[in-house]
Amino acid sequence: MGSSTGDLVTRIQSAHRFDHDALFRFAADNVSGFPTNPSQFKVSQFGHGQSNPTFLIEVGSGSSLKRYVLRKKPPGKLLQSAHAVDREFQVLRALGEHTQVPVPKVFCLCTDPAVIGTAFYIMEFMEGRIFIDPKLPNVAPERRNAIYRATAKALASLHSADVDAIGLEKYGRRGNYCKRQIDRWFKQYLASTSEGKPERNPKMFELVDWLRKNIPAEDSTGATSGLVHGDFRIDNLVFHPSEDRVIGIIDWELSTLGNQMCDVAYSCMHYIVNVQLDKEHVSEGFETTGLPEGMLSMPEFLLEYCSASGKPWPAANWKFYVAFSLFRAASIYTGVYSRWLMGNASAGERARNTGVQANELVESALGYIARENVLPEHPPSVQRDVSPSYESLVDGSGRFIPNRKVLELRQKLIKFMETHIYPMENEFSKLAQSDMRWTVHPQEEKLKEMAKREGLWNLFVPVDSAARARRELAATENKHNLSGKSFDQLFGEGLTNLEYGYLCEIMGRSVWAPQVFNCGAPDTGNMEVILRYGNKEQISEWLIPLLEGRIRSGFAMTEPQVASSDATNIECSIRRQGDSYVINGTKWWTSGAMDPRCRVLILMGKTDFNAPKHKQQSMILVDMRTPGISVKRPLTVFGFDDAPHGHAEISFENVVVPAKNILLGEGRGFEIAQGRLGPGRLHHCMRLIGAAERGMELMAQRALSRKTFGKFIAQHGSFVSDLAKLRVELEGTRLLVLEAADHLDKFGNKKARGILAMAKVAAPNMALKVLDTAIQVHGAAGVSSDTVLAHLWATARTLRIADGPDEVHLGTIGKLELQRASKL
């Protein structure tokens, strides 16, 4: 079992004692929400780790207790450039504020040594598990497997961070990383073994000579460069208290920009060697001693990482990267041993063996270099966790094969649709065409409760956004009176965009289905905006009721007087007036605003008409009941008004909204829009795949049951040919959409924008072609309301305009293609 993060503390070592009163005064002044008059203030030291001393701060009154983590430079004379806590703070803040990489939230940095003796920073305490022993003793085999897969995915997530976009472009030099690292760590080694310090090992010089002669060519080109953690091991990960997923990557002291394959190799050290501070010697790793049951082999771990990160198989240069990692570890352990001799090693007496271990690591590196084969030339063929029921989804095998969890959810979803949704479609349509169209069918609310019980609720919620919302809400009062199970249910099943794609497609087979599972537009996009960009108060006031399905929402962006496909044209004004904003303007095609349950709009307008054109727009949460909001009329789409949620034209006349409702801050609207539209567009594409499948199914059934000119439609050669071509186009589009989802998971909105644009162009055009042919096969019945085809077609046609018209997306695709060509 893993060790609880709170159980890894011990008494403060004498060499690391400092003024607790000074720390308290600093924290009270600089940490938001830090108790100022506590009855308890306790500082303990974490015993795990050999580098920057790390401490647990516990502060509170009565039964209320808050915990924080302090990380500081060690005292005494230090090696140049080592123990840079300011760099740790910088990278943690950038990742925490701008990415979904799981890291603890940082609160403040102090560089004044007068406070507690050395520089330090304070961050959140993450309640979870740390696995100190890579063998994962007392862990079930299937959980060992899941933990190592989660480790590989966490590393891939870290490596996907766009350093240029998050302000880390100058965090280090990217090219010639290994060359510089060899020089740096060799200098550190020499400094740690100078006169009066541990004796130098001649074999270290032999190892350095080999490394310098075998640096991969990719290192100088920067082809493998990006953010590097520098000490990525399983014991530097915090796992969820009960789930096998990473919630925090810690110990960033060695982070920089450079060759990311060095991180990958270092994370595999336990396969090569077994190094433990409480052991006198380095022993052999899992490759020699054998894998614990359920453990991934090194090739399987690498395959998991390469699949998640999109990196090529590293066989060609693997020997170098492992030898380099062993060399660096030897240099680090030599430095630890030198500090132990001086009496200021963070690990205390546990560091007494590091001198011997450093020399044994050098021997291990030279032994690894002498091996003929270290990694298979090609990645292993891993038997995926796939159910035989997948055969009904697609024949053969390929890259995008859903795992067992997704397949089980998919089967439940299909059964729910067949049992409850399809039989109710006519009833829902009748109400939507009656005088009571702007009311909600009572059966819909019953179906929602059933969907919750079945675990089919809020499946769209991305695992990273859910983690952020949980963190934000953890420190607030539970004013919604949610039990643990009810609270967890709000955040779905922890799916990636790729995994959700298989389920969203099923919902897309009916225009009525998405809202039953609380996965309908515009609510999903609005909820994701608040999940990603909302503060604690906004999450509590608006997101929780939306996630519960108690209210619905609208999105107000498009305006009748301007071409709104260019968001810089938006004219609606949002003027600051004291503690409020005053909104004036007209919006139309405000989806969801006609719904009687609609309580909040996300409105896009301009807060500064004189700012740079992409900094003029802001987004703000607007309560629908605010005076000055007037719904002028419902709008129709080819005659469909999409009751009961509808699309409204709305005027805003001096609508006063609290300033606290602004999302992310003034001038961030364009940024939010891009973040919202990426997943939102993809959800539309996924649903369109389902709509096309429904069209194919109805078309084939009709062709097999209706005769023209003496034979069934299915017997006409032209129909068979058309049907085959449509199937080819549908499958190609499905793969494109899944590829876009995969890119969105791995690389984020910005890097995936090209393939997202391709999917957004391809999906509606393909669906229209399929549905148009299905309508044609049905004849007059196809354009009537007796089938779902006309409504599905109208929705698909709208999506060639909504969330960006085809022309805008084609422009994006073309520009990226030209940029690619210009770099050749």
UniProtKB/Swiss-Prot annotation:
For this chain's UniProt record, which GO biological process terms are given? fatty acid metabolic process; root hair elongation
Q: Which domain of life is it from?
A: Eukaryota
Please give the record's induction comment.
Answer: By infection with the bacterial pathogen P.syringae pv. tomato strain DC3000.
Where would I look for the motif Microbody targeting signal in this sequence?
822-824
**Null mutant phenotype:** Defective in root hair expansion. Mutant plants are resistant to the inhibitory effect of intermediate levels of indole-3-butyric acid (IBA) and 2,4-DB on root elongation.
- Short name of one Pfam family for this protein? Acyl-CoA_dh_M
Chain sites annotated for binding FAD = 555-565, 589-591, 706, 776-780
Positions bearing N-acetylglycine? G2
Q: What is the effect of changing H229Y?
A: In ibr3-11; resistance to the inhibitory effect of intermediate levels of indole-3-butyric acid (IBA) on root elongation
Q: What is its EC number?
A: 1.3.99.-
Reactions catalysed? a 2,3-saturated acyl-CoA + A = a 2,3-dehydroacyl-CoA + AH2
Q: Give all cystine bridges in this chain.
A: none
Question: Which cofactor names does the annotation list?
Answer: FAD
**Compartments it resides in:** Peroxisome
| Keyword vocabulary terms for this entry | Acetylation, FAD, Fatty acid metabolism, Flavoprotein, Lipid metabolism, Oxidoreductase, Peroxisome
Instruction: List the record's Gene Ontology CC terms alphabetically.
Output: peroxisome
GO MF annotations in UniProt: flavin adenine dinucleotide binding; oxidoreductase activity, acting on the CH-CH group of donors
- EC supergroup of this enzyme: oxidoreductase
The miscellaneous comment for this protein is:
Plants over-expressing IBR3 exhibit enhanced susceptibility to the bacterial pathogen P.syringae pv. tomato strain DC3000.
What is the documented function of this protein?
Involved with IBR1 and IBR10 in the peroxisomal beta-oxidation of indole-3-butyric acid (IBA) to form indole-3-acetic acid (IAA), a biologically active auxin. May be responsible for catalyzing the first step in IBA-CoA beta-oxidation. May play a role in defense response to pathogenic bacteria.
The text of the family note is: Belongs to the acyl-CoA dehydrogenase family.
The identity of this protein, by name, is: Probable acyl-CoA dehydrogenase IBR3
